[in-house]
Amino acid sequence: MAQNDTPVKALVLAGGGARGSYQVGVWRALTELGWRPQIITGTSVGSLNGAMFALDLYETARDMWMSIRSQDVMELPEENADLSELHAFLREVVRDGGMDVTPLEEIVERVLDEDALRASPIRFGLVTVEKRGLKPRELTLEDIPAGKVKDYLLASAACFPALRAKQIDGVQFLDGGYRDNMPTALAQKMGAEELVCVDLEGVGITLPNRTGLPTTMIRSYWELGDILHFDPDTARRNMELGYYDTRRAMGYLRGCAYAVSTSAESCEDAAAFAWKFQQVQKAVREKYPVTLTADAALLLANMKDAQLAPLEAAAEDAGVDPTVFYTTRTLAEAFLEKCDRERIESFAPLFEGSGNAAQAARAALLPNTFLQALVCRALTKRRDRKSVV
């Protein structure tokens, strides 16, 4: 334990290339909530982000992610390159063992100060892999020779074979994700007693967490984009997702796919919606077996908040924006605005008791659309319990 009897906290940042923007949103939320780590460990892009976080460079990290594009990280062919030029580029990539990451090296050189990182009160560690024999190297700042921190950060992020291996003092190093994409064990070795882990579901090997330490896992329900496609719009979206997912993981939001308020009014509305949804299901199930198809759609969506699960699954299918803060009521309103009313109204006879076998069969063939219809009915049909919208 730390001197004030609070556990030593560690932030563990996984690798995942361009998805790393998500971790900036996580950092913003943790800072707002007053959760400060004494230790940060990272692999690949997680090590680059972790170094900036250890230096308290949130604005720098945010602005960097909001501005960089793929060509700012690696040498790419011109957008208007013809086929012969593309072939020449690919031959060069194969010959040189991956794409040139000089642009990334320039970014790291510009934003990271080794002396300041060594002076930070936050202890820092990273994982990289020796290319020969794929030997993992867990390194704390104390293990890294003076003047070599930026080299080892780039080594940790050398996503071979897409990117070139990083050579340091005659030894070639690869992305740490080849052996340990989520360095929880390193955090424990450095003295951690409580972990917050941020998973980007990147390529590589994520070892089981065998530390036995209290662990909060932060992971997006949503796809975060391609690992080698750096784009400001995607970064902006990922940061918002990371922010809300962290607040949810820490108990300040509810929902699974959407950031939903835990206020008393919102929770009352969620309970009211769940009751109305069950009543609609029950009424239809008494006449047709088609509600089973909606249940299947819910299982596929894998929503963990039982009261909100149907609304969240329907909202996702309708294309409701997940980067916005909602109450139950505003999420319901957003769904009703986005859903295709004309399409789901075709199921109305099933709710009114005048449906036929063909309509029931159509519901069975379109479980997601039928789930939307059930949710829409629950939200708009007036009953003897509090209305959600």
Identify the role of each PLM range.
Residues 1-43, 51-389:
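Patatin-like phospholipase
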